[in-house]
Amino acid sequence: MFLEELKPVTRELCQQPIAFAGGFVSGVLRLKLTDDPLKKWLQKQGVTDFSGADINQTAQDNRPQSIDID
């Protein structure tokens, strides 16, 4: 059962190991792709799309949300 949950991770690791490792390391180190040194390096590498890289959360986003179930 636990192995079933790891299948998507292992599939991505096998398909694109370098991209997976880079994403994993940047996540562990909490690097933001829009920070200046990393952003300049990525632009030199040809990456220009940072649309999903920066998640701006305000204090209101961190509080519990209420939902209505009909």
From Swiss-Prot:
Family indicated by similarity: Belongs to the UPF0426 family.
Protein name: UPF0426 protein ssl0294
Domain of life per record: Bacteria
InterPro entries: UPF0426
Species this chain originates from: Synechocystis sp. (strain ATCC 27184 / PCC 6803 / Kazusa)
